[in-house]
């Protein structure tokens, strides 16, 4: 026989972002509880609304299975003396509720120990579930609060608990002064208390009180209602999945409705209107079949359709006030010339320790030029990027961005066009913030990518040079995100810049004033920090840490080259030949590392003594002449071909011979080969089997 179990925690309104994660955590903890208690079940269902977290365990067995547990005691030498059981043995069995007659002997690692088997009768599920309170109190949350005079902390105050095993209340469950029962609560305004007779009746009992407890069901219902409104009015209503998730997490009984606003607000740029509706009001925006924004919106009420027209009017009133502000800000911003905005940037701090936003733009202009020269970019790209760099932060002091900070860059593009800038300059201004997340969109234009790299590099270098380094999980200036974005752009545009050498150069040129005598410390941190971000990027290609280390520890810090090398190693690492190739290349790296002082100078042909030595040197010299033009794939192919020549050389020749001239000569060409190998990867980091 099996039963079902229901556990519901009634709370004050939860923040939308924690509803689903908290529900999933509760379900996992309940599942683990029954697994740990050796109680089998068929399934665990999770339920959640802003006012409750609940789980139902289906097909829960009525008792634990009996089991035998083996206990190891002291060694036989201690447990038995002169043919009689010692006090140690008697104490051991007495502690298990057994006698010395139950002892048997088994050998463990060559030593005999006494053992006993204890029969443990399974407990009834009814007895075990009395301990479920710990599941509630052990839950962890990002933020917590206290209430009343209690010191106990939880995501939100607990107001009621429903705990049923079959038809019976588990009365032993409780938290603080809240004891379990079978009374749940319906919708805050439309519903009443709901008596839950058994776990199977949970959804129905609460649905009668205007609560849909299944979050996915609410989500599907909201989607269906929006699609019906779109079909009825011949609209296109894009359904943003994040917004849909949020909306379904802040209501218990959804009813979608349409509202409208004055057409005069359509002169305001679309991103402003969309942000006002979507981000600030949690509305879904409406388009016609030509994908033009319409003066309508769709919202979702937490309730039924009673007096829904009044609800729509109330929402329209709130939105109108916000759009009126947006229209005013837009019209005022259009009256202000670019020079005025740029003047204001002189008094806008980028950071008190670093300087103004104008000073940042000056540094970024220099950086754009240095990067463009390093990357050999066309002059028209440089002109566009430098013009953008000279004004790209101007929108930060506009009225619109002051009200809608999430539109920085977007309004920069719109206003730049209005001020007469070229489309390319305006696009670069918008794109310099990209990417805004790990999987966010990247710039599509070269000037935009160039400006984005320069801006991110300046932010990173100026903060770190000034000593404001991220520590642990604390990264107040989002430097990890800045550098990861930089790495992503370099990879996407295949810009082969030795980023480590370049940043060292920049520290001495443009950021020396911030360093305050800590050049070596800051430089070491910067290089390590960049390598960590590159390693994270490589981890999207391969999960093998040895390959990641091999690539990151190579001689190159060109991100595209490193990513390509990682792909090559990931592809060839499972081949039969890879172990032999790696071992051959490692012999070269290892012997060269031990004798670097002897490896300088020119390779002397007259000192080559054997055929294998001459063959290897010829191959090294040929490879060295073209290594700069080879892709990582091509370079590995050459190293693969060279591996047998390396083995032949080591089989026939000794490197560390007594003759100094011969020894030095061999170390020279092996040192050269080692550098070529390390340009691809540090093979000594690889684990081969």
Where are each of the predicted segments found?
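Amphipathic alpha-helical "coupling" segments that flank catalytic cores
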Residues: 1-689
């Amino acid at each position: 026989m099996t039963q079902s179990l229901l556990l519901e925690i009634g709370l004050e309104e939860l923040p939308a972002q924690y509803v689903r994660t908290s529900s999933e955590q509760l379900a996992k903890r309940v599942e683990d509880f029954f697994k740990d208690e050796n109680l089998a079940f068929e399934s665990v269902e999770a339920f959640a609304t802003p006012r409750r977290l609940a789980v139902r365990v289906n097909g829960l067995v009525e008792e634990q299975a009996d089991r035998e547990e083996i206990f190891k005691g002291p060694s036989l030498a201690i447990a038995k003396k002169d043919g009689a059981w010692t006090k140690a043995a008697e104490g051991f069995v007495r502690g298990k509720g057994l006698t010395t007659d139950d002892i048997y002997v088994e050998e463990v690692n060559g030593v005999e120990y006494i053992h006993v088997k204890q029969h443990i009768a399974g407990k009834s599920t009814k007895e075990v579930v009395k301990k479920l309170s710990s599941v509630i109190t052990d839950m962890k949350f990002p933020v917590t609060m206290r209430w009343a005079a209690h010191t106990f902390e939880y995501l939100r105050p607990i107001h009621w608990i429903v705990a049923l095993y079959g038809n019976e209340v588990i009365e032993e469950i409780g938290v603080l002064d809240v004891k379990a029962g079978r009374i749940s609560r319906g919708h805050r305004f439309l519903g009443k208390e709901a008596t839950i007779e058994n776990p199977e009746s949970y959804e129905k009992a609460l649905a009668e009180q205007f609560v849909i407890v299944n979050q996915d069901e609410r989500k599907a219902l909201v989607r269906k209602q929006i699609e019906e409104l779109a079909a009825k009015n011949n609209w296109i209503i894009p359904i943003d999945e994040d917004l849909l998730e949020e909306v379904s997490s802040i209501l218990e009984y959804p009813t979608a409705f349409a509202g409208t606003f004055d057409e005069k607000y359509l002169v305001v740029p679309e991103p402003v209107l969309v942000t006002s509706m979507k981000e600030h009001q949690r509305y879904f925006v409406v388009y016609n079949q030509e994908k033009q924004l319409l003066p309508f919106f769709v919202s979702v009420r937490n309730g039924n359709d009673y007096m829904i027209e009044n609800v729509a009017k109330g929402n329209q009133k709130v939105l109108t006030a916000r759009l009126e502000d947006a229209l005013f800000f837009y019209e005022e911003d259009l009256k202000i010339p670019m020079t005025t905005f740029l003047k204001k940037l002189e008094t806008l701090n980028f950071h008190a320790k670093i300087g103004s936003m104008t000073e940042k733009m000056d540094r970024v202009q220099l950086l754009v030029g240095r990067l463009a020269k390093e990357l050999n970019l066309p002059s028209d790209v440089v002109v566009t990027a430098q013009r953008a760099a000279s004004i790209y932060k101007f929108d930060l002091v506009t009225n619109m961005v002051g009200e809608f900070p999430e539109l920085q860059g977007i309004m920069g593009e719109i206003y730049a066009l209005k001020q007469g800038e070229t489309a390319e300059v305006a696009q670069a201004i918008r794109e310099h913030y990209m990417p805004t997340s790990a999987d966010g969109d990247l710039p599509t234009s070269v000037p935009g990518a160039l400006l984005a790299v320069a801006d991110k590099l300046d932010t990173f270098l100026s903060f770190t040079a000034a000593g404001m380094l991220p520590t642990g999980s604390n990264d107040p200036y989002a430097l990890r995100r800045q550098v990861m974005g930089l790495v992503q752009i370099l990879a996407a545009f295949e810009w082969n810049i030795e980023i480590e050498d370049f940043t060292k150069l920049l520290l001495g040129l443009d950021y020396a004033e911030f360093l305050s005598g800590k050049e070596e410390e800051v430089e070491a941190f910067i290089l390590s920090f960049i390598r960590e971000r590159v390693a994270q990027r490589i981890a999207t290609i391969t999960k093998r840490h040895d390959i990641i280390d091999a690539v990151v520890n190579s001689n190159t810090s060109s991100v595209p080259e490193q990513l390509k090398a990682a792909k090559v190693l990931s592809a060839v690492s499972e081949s039969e030949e890879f172990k032999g190739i790696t071992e051959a290349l490692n012999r070269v790296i290892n012997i060269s590392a031990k004798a670097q002082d002897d490896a300088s100078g020119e390779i002397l042909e007259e000192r080559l003594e054997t055929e294998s030595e001459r063959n290897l040197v010829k191959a090294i010299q040929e490879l060295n002449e073209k290594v700069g033009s080879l892709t990582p794939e091509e370079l590995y192919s050459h190293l693969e071909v060279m591996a047998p020549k390396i083995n032949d050389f080591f089989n026939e020749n000794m490197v560390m011979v007594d003759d100094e001239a011969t020894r030095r000569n061999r170390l020279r060409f092996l040192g050269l080969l080692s550098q070529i190998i390390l340009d691809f990867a540090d093979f000594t980091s690889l684990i081969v089997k």
